[in-house]
Amino acid sequence: MAENGESSGPPRPSRGPAAAPGAASPPAEPKIIKVTVKTPKEKEEFAVPENSTVQQFKEAISKRFKSQTDQLVLIFAGKILKDQDTLMQHGIHDGLTVHLVIKSQNRPQGQATTQPSTTAGTSTTTTTTTTAAAPAATTSSAPRSSSTPTTTNSSSFGLGSLSSLSNLGLNSPNFTELQNQMQQQLLASPEMMIQIMENPFVQSMLSNPDLMRQLIMANPQMQQLIQRNPEISHLLNNPDIMRQTLEIARNPAMMQEMMRNQDLALSNLESIPGGYNALRRMYTDIQEPMLNAAQEQFGGNPFATVGSSSTSGEGTQPSRTENRDPLPNPWAPPPTTQTAATTTTTTTTSSGSGSGSSSSSTTAGNTMAAANYVASIFSTPGMQSLLQQITENPQLIQNMLSAPYMRSMMQSLSQNPDMAAQMMLSSPLFTSNPQLQEQMRPQLPNFLQQMQNPETIAAMSNPRAMQALMQIQQGLQTLATEAPGLIPSFAPGVGMGVLGTAITPVGPVTPIGPIGPIVPFTPIGPIGPIGPTGPASSPGSTGTGIPPATTVSSSAPTETISPTSESGPNQQFIQQMVQALTGGSPPQPPNPEVRFQQQLEQLNAMGFLNREANLQALIATGGDINAAIERLLGSQPS
């Protein structure tokens, strides 16, 4: 027994070393590596085992990006990663970056059916510990990435390379009410919408597909829509489709004709068997909910007053009753009683001006036409409601003027007076009056500097000051209409110089057709010069309305814009937008290398090192990086 005890004793410690390899095998789990997955818009970090397959890596990525695994294409070193391969086979180590391309749903359906059959046998032979480690690793970093999508939903306004216009203070309820009221006025007055679309500024912007695509793609709501429906990105990245869409948008008559053809096609459905039932279901399921939503938001059906004068509730028939009456024509002009405009062609020349009677008569004629035109615009309910909103909500104006975007635009215009003058002179209100152009041109730099003055912004946020400016504006309108000969050099603006600082901030929100930018004015007869906001009681005030003590130097705007660092891509976008708006003709397209600089850098980072081939692919696809990648991969030898 002793021998047995002695003999049995040594094996016990000998089992310790023998059990060491068995005990070391469970701790020898695969190494967890951190791999960065980068898309053209965002970047995420994943922690996965190093021996994971590409298919398992895609499953972890699909949960984060909310896409199907067959839509994901992983690219590393210029090669597409196959599902059955492992990360170690491609040399993917800790800290490296893998590029991700998300395909649309309708394209990869043919490939998605063949890949699982080939990868099923290989993926099942991999270790089972990786499947449990990968989700645990991804969930640890999920809360960090979940904070990024929520910031894009904070504001529905996006512009250019700006993330959003949330810094403008546009999330306040006051701006939402103002926006809804503006939309209601545009629906109730199609003429105002036509004037906006025919404005040279808007025409120049719509003639640049790249600028419009940049504006659309920068909108957070459009980004979410494209992520949910990737096929829309191909429409936006197709320059031909964008050009056709913008051509239709610039031509309201063409848009109305297309809508009319659509209505005619729908009305012809009644002659087809079963077509009436389809129309009834469409009106019941689609039209009525849309009209109810429009009535809740805008307060009424905009097409209700076109067909009949009855209320919206009286003319509605039950859904099961057959409607024999023809549909009203929504494009028929409303029966409005227009008052005859008193246009006096004969002008009375003053006794003091004996020279140039013919030139004074033509100038007075232009003055009367411009005065009546601008007065008619400012007498519309939309403009009156807009001005009332401005006076009731001075905080809205202060938020807009103190926003980095507004200050950056003012700085860009003040640094380039010629560009600002070109923007102003391209308005139809000034193109027909060269004398007025010469008066406005030298005053633009002072006006732009005054708009950056903090005292001007503070004065505009004062409700009493705004009411006083409104009274001056209304009085000058009356003078310009009733006695245009008293202030001939002032009448075309109808007092907008004095109220310039109060109404100019509304320009970026609602451009009202041919009014154009608002500038200060010079002499008003014997009253003397009136500046935009110069205090009347301040001694030593100059003729331009800028007190000598508060003259803003050229370096002042740069100090106010420094906190938000607007000199980066935002400043470049603003300059590009201003250049696009100022051009009388569509701007010339830039060099393709400059135009697709960002896409070339992304392709180079993905491993596509042939710059010439990348550039040709981007030119052929119109800058669509996904289509360019597919084109480059299709041209590579298999």
UniProtKB/Swiss-Prot annotation:
Q: Where are the sequence repeats?
A: 505-507, 508-510, 511-513, 514-516, 517-519, 520-522, 523-525, 526-528, 529-531, 532-533, 535-537
Biased-composition ranges, Low complexity, are 1-26, 112-158, 305-316, 337-364, 533-551
STI1 domain boundaries: 189-217, 219-258, 393-440, 444-476
Q: Where in the cell is it found?
A: Cytoplasm; Nucleus; Membrane; Cytoplasmic vesicle, Autophagosome
Is Nucleus one of the keywords UniProt gives this record? yes
Pfam families recorded: UBA, ubiquitin, UBQLN1
**Region 11 X 3 AA tandem repeats P-X-X: what ranges?**
505-537
User: So which tissues is this one expressed in?
Assistant: Highly expressed in smooth muscle. Expression in other tissues is very low.
The segments labelled Disordered in the record are 1-31, 107-158, 298-364, 528-570
Quaternary structure per UniProt?
Homodimer. Forms heterodimer with UBQLN1. Binds UBE3A and BTRC. Interacts with the 19S proteasome subunit. Interacts with C9orf72. Binds CD47. Interacts with HNRNPA1 and HNRNPU. Found in a complex with UBQLN1 and MAP1LC3A/B/C. Interacts with EPS15, EPN1 and EPN2. Interacts with HERPUD1. Interacts with RAD23A. Interacts with TARDBP. Interacts (via C-terminus) with FAF2 (via N-terminus). Interacts with UBQLN4.
Q: What is this protein called?
A: Ubiquilin-2
Which taxonomic lineage is given here? Eukaryota, Metazoa, Chordata, Craniata, Vertebrata
